[in-house]
Amino acid sequence: MAQTFSDEHFTLGIEEEYLLVDAETYDLAEAPDALMAACADKLSSKVSPEFLQCQIEVGTGVCASIADARADLRNLRATVAECAGRFGLAPIAVSCHPFADWKDQSHTDKDRYNQLARDLGGVVERMLICGAHCHVGLPSENDRVDIMRQMTYFLPHLLALSTSSPFWQGRDTGLASYRLTVFDNLPRTGLPPSFASFDEFQRTVDLLVDMEMIEDSSKIWWDLRPSAAFPTLETRICDVSPRLEDQLSLSALIQCLTRMLMRLRGSNQRWRVYDRFLINENRWRAQRYGVSDGLIDFGRGAVVPLPELVDELIELTEQDAEALGCVDEVQRLRDLAVETSSDRQRKIYKGTRAAGGSHQAAMRSVVEHLLEDFHVDL
C-alpha cells in the first residue's frame, strides 16, 4: 500500500556557527562572558558558545516554512552582530578564517568541551572550523533512517553549493571546502552507513554506548544523521554560508529533497542507493572543486557540470518547492551553481593582489568581504 504524509511534518530548524573577529584587526577574538550574557538576554537558548572561545552558535526554533526560518535566522544574525559590536567584535559566517592560526585559540571551559579535549587529544585542537546544520522534521524513526539512506546521494551536491573555506592559516589550500579536511580527522565522521531500520541504527549506537566509547548518538558526527535531540533528520555536510539568503536556499533544497523522497515512497518508488565508495568520490570532488568542476552522474557514467545538475534538482523538486512555499529560494540555487563563497573569496584576494596589495592586505580584504556578506541580507 502507498504511504501518505503531511506537509506539516517537514518542519525546519537551522543551526549556524560563526567566528568572532576583532573589528579593527580582523583577527579572531574570544567572546567575553558579557557578550554571551547580552546575546542570551535577547535570544535565550537560541545562542550558545561553541568548542572554541572565538566561536558562537545560533539555532532557530522549529519553523513551519522557509519564510519563518528567514525571519528567525535574520533576527539571530542581526542580534549577534549588534551585541558583538558593543565589544568591538563582529561575527562572520565562514567555515575557515582566512589567516588565523588554530594554535592561538583556546577551547571553551565547559564540561562537554573539556571532555572532548580529553577524548580527542591534539586532533580536536585544530577544529577552527564552522558548519551549518539543517534539521527537517520526520516524526517516524524508520522514516529518518530510510530517507537517510537515499538522501546520502545528494550530500556532495549540497557540499559543492555551500563551499566557503578555501583558505587556511593564510594560504590558499586549493580546495573549495578545507573545513571538511579538518573535520574528517575526527572519528565517526563522513558519509553515514546504510541501515535497514531504525532498530539496526539504534543497536549500533547502543553497542558503542554500552562499551562507554560514547555517551550517546550526539557524538556521532556523520554528514547526515537522525538527530539525537529532535524528531528530525539532520544534514551536517554543508559549510556555513556567509550570506543569509544562500543559507536559506540550501535549507530549502534539503527540505524539498526530503519531501521528494517521501513522495516517491508514497508511490512505491525510491531513489537508488549507491555504494558509499562511489558517493565518496563525488564528496571529494565537491570538497576539492566546489562548483568549478562537475560531479559524477552514476546513471549516465559521466561528469556533469553543477549548473546542469542544479537544473535537474530544481525540476526534480518542483512540486515539492511549490507545496512547501520555497520556489524562489530553490531557484536561487542557480546562482550558487555558478559561484559560491569560496569563489568570491578567491576573487577578492586575487583582485587585491593584482591592484598591488600585499598578501596580508589581501587576506584582510577577504575578511572585510565576509563581514559585508554577513550583513547583506539583514
Swiss-Prot record:
Q: Which reaction does it catalyse?
A: L-cysteine + L-glutamate + ATP = gamma-L-glutamyl-L-cysteine + ADP + phosphate + H(+)
UniProt cross-references to InterPro entries, sorted A to Z: GCL_type2/YbdK_subfam (IPR050141), GCS2 (IPR006336), Gln_synth/guanido_kin_cat_dom (IPR014746), YbdK (IPR011793)
Entry GO MF terms: ATP binding; glutamate-cysteine ligase activity
Q: Which residues form the signal peptide?
A: none
State the top-level EC class. Answer: ligase
Entry keyword set: ATP-binding, Ligase, Nucleotide-binding
Look up the EC number in the record and give it: 6.3.2.2
| Record-linked SUPFAM superfamilies | Glutamine synthetase/guanido kinase (SSF55931)
Q: List, alphabetically, the Pfam families matched.
A: GCS2
Q: Is Transferase a UniProt keyword of this protein?
A: no
Q: Which domain of life is it from?
A: Bacteria
Gene Ontology biological process terms from the UniProt entry: modified amino acid biosynthetic process
Known function:
ATP-dependent carboxylate-amine ligase which exhibits weak glutamate--cysteine ligase activity.
Q: Which family does it belong to?
A: Belongs to the glutamate--cysteine ligase type 2 family. YbdK subfamily.
Query: What protein is this chain from?
Result: Putative glutamate--cysteine ligase 2
